[in-house]
Amino acid sequence: MLLGLQWGDEGKGKIVDVLTPSYDIIARFQGGPNAGHTLEFEGEKYILRSIPSGIFQGDKINVIGNGVVLDPILFAEEARALSRSGHDLRKRLVISRKAHLILPTHRMIDAAQEAAKGGAKIGTTGKGIG
């Protein structure tokens, strides 16, 4: 289990990418599509925000768990990019039916709350998850 205990952007995704060959199941159990992480696989660069980086390991099962906050629009873009490159998500990606969804209203609320903080704002990514 790898946990990020800061504000994010600690390099968790790259560490998971290094560790994935040693495991059969790679699962995201919480979090959302904030900044994402950039990985290079077979000479191509990919930005993953929702899909676990084990997707590049041909025989691994990847899980998006019920604690994950999933933006369906960003997820679809990410999935299309991976599919165009030959990564078959249908056989190797499992999404919990209890995963939370980010809706456009969440992004609007996020922006309004951040604006209301004035000089005390924390610099949200504006993705609707705070």
PLM features: what roles do these ranges have?
Residues 1-129:
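Non-transmembrane, aqueous-exposed alpha-helical and coiled segments at domain scale
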